[in-house]
Amino acid sequence: SIIKKAYPAAEKMTDLLDGALMNAGPIIHPPLIMMNAGPLEHFDVWDIHNEGTQPSIRSVTDSLDKERISLREALGYREPHFPLKNHYDDTLEEWMYGNSSHEKLTNSGDWREKIDLHNHRYMREDTALGLAFLCSLGRWKNHLMPISEGLLAIASGITGEILYESGRSLESLGLADLTVDEMKNMLEKGIAV
């Protein structure tokens, strides 16, 4: 294809949902901001990618990513899934951002910032839109997503909003009543206007 010629490393996606389930933001950022809420609110600036990325937080991130991959598989999507753990370990298969990307990120100092837990994009985009969407897909497919649901509940407690209701979900998009076959058909052919 013309895209493969222009971008040889590009991976072919089955459909839009396949691509959406590759978004790393809802996997990386919700654990980092929820589990670093104290330091983020206490210190003037805090680097969630450096001091904020500790073994227990990485463990939650890996568990969250396993849910994403398991959901992809339950929806019939095949590899590559680009597991996030590869971003943190250059001895594993190269991740979508390339080897050494995490080291470059933490060494840059660019991420030492003030994060407002109510309005920052990690809460508004990656959590209220991205993580809520993953939770809604899990509910729709009757696929357990306890880490996703737990982080979304904590985020709701922080913001004082029920982010599942105010965020992006199949319900808010008017797609929750579709069957799996209807969803696949819509993703392949679009919506008749």
Functional labels for PLM-detected ranges:
Residues 1-85:
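Internal alpha-helical scaffold of NAD(P)-dependent oxidoreductase catalytic cores
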Residues 44, 55-193:
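NAD(P)-dependent Rossmann-like dehydrogenase/reductase catalytic/cofactor-binding core
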